[in-house]
């Protein structure tokens, strides 16, 4: 019999579970204030849905061996998009949904071993609004919810944003044969491969400039306009940044526009973003999302009618941050109810019930104690802070 959990799966201690629950609760509270309704997408879905129209590699899906091709969800967006386009298709738009749950990813290590990555996610999906307003609401909600989590400023959060069409704009000036290679070079920040490409002097310099082009949205947009002229996407991004910049400054969240940023999943068709925070060891992505019109249209009988975007937080990654732990009730008063030879377990339960009614955490010492001194010695062992002794 195995004595350890499966490689990559999570086994949390009580403190971690408590923190996860509190973080998820904090997020759900703000989702509800913004009018989002909770749904519970299935953990097991058909592979066609889980692959999100080819946006998610089947190798990342943990497959189950049954009659139908199914697997465990590697994320929740595709399942919620399917539900929005079928079960909730008659619901008025905009349709605001949120969900929280465990996701499972499969990956192969260098030695060939298959590892399961299990994590707790919480996020929102917004359906049915065409135009930049959908992105504005989601980015604003993302920033507001981050503030609700009371993450310490030492985490120095950065909201990294891009638009899928910016990469298309960038590669438009390159030859058809080199476009795919240029995309890979920019996405992977590959300086060596630039020198191997057959480019003229101006193209090579432009590519090097673009590879370094990230940071202040205003400066990046200005540079892109100088290279490619006025563009609807750049105009839309300017309007979005003008709206969200004041709140990001208020909460000390740095905004960055990175035209070469490419999300891991290829299901997005508009704005994409990641929320990155520093830990004691390395930066971590605690949230990611974007617009995925094509995915939701795949499930809809009237595809021209449906628009969608969303984001999700990784609760486990947030827990790694320097969160202000005073927001967690980590040391509540815990009362040990112990009884002596003259009392019974029934007396202890009645006493415990009265303490519970007053709001205390109270646990029972199931065996009777010889005397009060004996009971006092058990207080620390039972991880309690106080003794309630009953014997007469």
From Swiss-Prot:
GO terms for molecular function: histidine-tRNA ligase activity. Belongs to the class-II aminoacyl-tRNA synthetase family. HisZ subfamily. Pathway: Amino-acid biosynthesis; L-histidine biosynthesis; L-histidine from 5-phospho-alpha-D-ribose 1-diphosphate: step 1/9. Gene3D superfamilies: Bira Bifunctional Protein, Domain 2. Coiled coil: none annotated. It is found in: Cytoplasm. Heteromultimer composed of HisG and HisZ subunits. Its main location: cytoplasm. GO terms for cellular component: cytoplasm. InterPro entries: aa-tRNA-synth_II/BPL/LPL, HisRS-like_core, HisRS/HisZ, HisZ. Required for the first step of histidine biosynthesis. May allow the feedback regulation of ATP phosphoribosyltransferase activity by histidine. This is ATP phosphoribosyltransferase regulatory subunit. This function is generally fulfilled by the C-terminal part of HisG, which is missing in some bacteria such as this one. The keyword Lipid metabolism does not apply. GO terms for biological process: histidyl-tRNA aminoacylation; L-histidine biosynthetic process. Keywords: Amino-acid biosynthesis, Cytoplasm, Histidine biosynthesis.
